[in-house]
Amino acid sequence: MRFVAGEYDVCVVGLGHAGSEAALASARLGLSTVGFATNLDAIALMACNPSIGGPAKAQLVREIDALGGQMAINTDKSLLQMRTLNTSKGPAVRSLRAQVDKKLYQMNMKHTLERQENLDIKQAEIVDILVEDNKVTGVVTKLGAIYKCKACIITTGTFLKGRVIIGEVDFESGPSGLFPASELSEALKRLGFKLMRFKTGTPPRVDKRSIDFSKMEIQPGDEVITPFSFMHDKIEIEQMPCWLTYTNEKTHKIIRDNIHRAPLFTGAITGVGVRYCPSIEDKVVKFPHRERHQIFIEPEGRDTYEMYVQGMSSSLPEDVQLEFLRTVPGLENVRVMRPAYAIEYDCIDPTQLKATLESKWIEGLYFAGQVNGTSGYEEAAAQGLMAGINAAMKILNKPPVVLDRSQAYIGILIDDLVTKGTNEPYRMLTSRAEYRLLLRQDNADFRLTEIGKEIGLVTEERYEKFLRKKIQLEKEMRRLSTVMVRPTEEVNNFLISRGSTPLVSGVDLYTLLKRPEVDYKSTKFLDPDRPDDILDSVAEQIDINIKYEGYILKQLRQVEQFKAMENKKIPEDIDYYQISGLSNEAKEKLSKIRPTSVGQASRISGVSPADISVLLIYLQQMRKKKSNESRIS
């Protein structure tokens, strides 16, 4: 029997990485919010790797932080190790990667949710979404409780009709042995949503005490930790190392000899898997000439012996897993604490959503995270934040917040999903960003904190900290162009020692810093009036802004062209089938996606440059016609 148990502005279904950010954003914007999890002990569960960040993902985490989200703060609080990746490459692809204590991360996030004003969290499985006149009105729990709401955000991760597969064995399950959510899938189908079936997997967890680390290469963290959150100036902890080892021909032979037992190849797995995170059996089959594959052994926490075997995701039977693990140097006597498994789950086709992550036909119903076909904690958290913001904006009768591709990786992520869709679990990559030199992890605050302040998520403390940094950077950039450096013996010896050409005549320090061999910090002795309180983050910005000035200006000009196309808006009620000259495929795709701008239309697969030219002419004719009609009237 159903009964009304409560009424809120916003209901969030699922409290993983997407749901946690969505619930916090909504509550922090003043809306009464309730978040549901099938198990409150699994809030912000890190069901797979014990890490946050990496290429493109670190940029997402920094953007979440700059807008006022929680992930970066929580990562810093739960840190085991921090490494900066791609240090030998350009700033566009440099990325932080944090090893975190899984349980501490969960505990910190749960504590944050519990303390948040305007937010209740409840343990319940949601089995139905209530809709009247194409508007969300509430949700229903398995026990029959109805919670009325004005907006609902679905953030169910990999729980929808979850099925775990290990060799010949399969059973209904969510990740990490949790219950799946099967009834909500059927409810979404009844509401008209097209569902897809995706697959992901996770490697074994092994007992640290059974590992011989002397046969592995140690992977320490950075000597000086760079925090993920712009709110933190420094972090001082005792870091835990990771370890590197490799598979070998013995490993590969065992896998090949048992490939007939691999669900991936027997047809037992029907879901589409993650391209950029293949299982070990997939790697052995697809790359038969590779003599070895990297395996990283990563700690799962300070107070556990469990170690994560990165690079060995598998759905092979448990006995085969143990056999191939014990061929790896250092793992000869390994004890498995949790076997690897694959998990299949339902997700929606994200082209059914607007750029706000709201359903195109059910008002107030939003989706975020892996339910939208993405993979990764960071991608989920980014979507959750934006869904929470936009659900709140709608209820508050404020304009929606949509970041474009020139503003943030978050904008690229969502635009790709709603414009192109995905036929496999979507992972954010730096190669997806057209303007990646502008969208660096180091400048996320300069790009987005003002927007976060306008939304209402950025606190006064964060904003004041940002303004101090911004003013310091602007002042120092101006001052450097007034500092003259003479071609003295000391100066030229310094330049020669750096592998740089000696000066023949005087030059300002701003110009000197354009040289790749010279950096801001090393030139302090040339600059006696330099302020002593320059932040490390400001010094980094100075070097990047000066050295890459030409490339940055070039990308800014490209952004102007991009914005011009984005600003050419398309009426919501346009009938593409009435536009002569459009290809049939373009008519079909444009009618399905309903792009809001010519720029978005140009990114739809199957819409050619010729179709865009026809569309531009049609829109111009429409504007002229309306202009003439308004003059006549």
UniProtKB/Swiss-Prot annotation:
Gene Ontology biological-process annotations: tRNA methylation; tRNA wobble uridine modification
Primary location class: cytoplasm
GO cellular component: cytosol
Keywords tagged on the record: Cytoplasm, FAD, Flavoprotein, NAD, tRNA processing
Protein role: NAD-binding protein involved in the addition of a carboxymethylaminomethyl (cmnm) group at the wobble position (U34) of certain tRNAs, forming tRNA-cmnm(5)s(2)U34.
Record family assignment: Belongs to the MnmG family.
Annotated PANTHER family: GLUCOSE INHIBITED DIVISION PROTEIN A, PROTEIN MTO1 HOMOLOG, MITOCHONDRIAL
NCBIfam families registered for this protein in UniProt: mnmG_gidA
Name recorded for this polypeptide: tRNA uridine 5-carboxymethylaminomethyl modification enzyme MnmG 1
Organism: Caldanaerobacter subterraneus subsp. tengcongensis (strain DSM 15242 / JCM 11007 / NBRC 100824 / MB4) (Thermoanaerobacter tengcongensis)
